């Protein structure tokens, strides 16, 4: 699984739980419309699944 994922924060983390904010920070997403490129790993996929309503993922 050496593919990369482009993850964009499309909704703000305001009003979300601290765990949710921690997951976003763990992926490097700090502001709306910020895009990061991360390796496609099971750990990253798990974080994406927990914050799926806040992010957009491109493979």
Curated annotation (Swiss-Prot):
GO terms for biological process: translation. It comes from the Bacteria. InterPro entries: Ribo_uL30_ferredoxin-like_sf, Ribosomal_uL30_bac-type, Ribosomal_uL30_ferredoxin-like. GO terms for cellular component: cytosolic large ribosomal subunit. Belongs to the universal ribosomal protein uL30 family. Part of the 50S ribosomal subunit. This is Large ribosomal subunit protein uL30.
